[in-house]
């Protein structure tokens, strides 16, 4: 399963670990993803989605209507 948020499209980014001696090694920054069961009123069913913390905040503000459009 890929580490991509279904709502915001966030995916891993890459950067460097930098030590005190300024040695650099490549690092992968993972998005803060959570698997959630969400009740979609329009569909009258539970949907299991993998969303980021930012997407959960968006859903709490706007509701699940935006999510229902993506599922169809």
Swiss-Prot record:
Q: Which InterPro entries match?
A: Ribosomal_bL28, Ribosomal_bL28/bL31-like_sf, Ribosomal_bL28_bact-type, Ribosomal_bL28_sf
Q: Which SUPFAM superfamilies match?
A: L28p-like
The disulfides recorded in the entry are none
List the record's Gene Ontology CC terms alphabetically.
ribonucleoprotein complex; ribosome
State the UniProt keywords alphabetically: Ribonucleoprotein, Ribosomal protein
UniProt key word Ribosomal protein = yes
Q: Which GO terms describe its biological process?
A: translation
User: What is a single Pfam family found in this protein's UniProt entry?
Assistant: Ribosomal_L28
Tell me one GO molecular function of this protein: structural constituent of ribosome
Could you say which protein family the record assigns here? Belongs to the bacterial ribosomal protein bL28 family.
PANTHER family membership: 39S RIBOSOMAL PROTEIN L28, MITOCHONDRIAL, LARGE RIBOSOMAL SUBUNIT PROTEIN BL28M
Q: What is this protein called?
A: Large ribosomal subunit protein bL28
Instruction: Give the species.
Output: Chlorobium phaeobacteroides (strain BS1)
């Amino acid at each position: 399963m890929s580490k991509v948020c279904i709502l915001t499209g966030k995916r891993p980014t890459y950067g460097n670990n930098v030590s005190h001696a300024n040695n650099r090694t490549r690092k992968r920054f993972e998005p803060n993803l959570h698997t959630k069961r969400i009740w979609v009123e329009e569909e009258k069913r539970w949907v299991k989605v993998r969303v980021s913390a930012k997407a959960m905040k968006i859903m709490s503000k706007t509701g699940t209507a935006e999510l229902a459009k993506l599922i169809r």
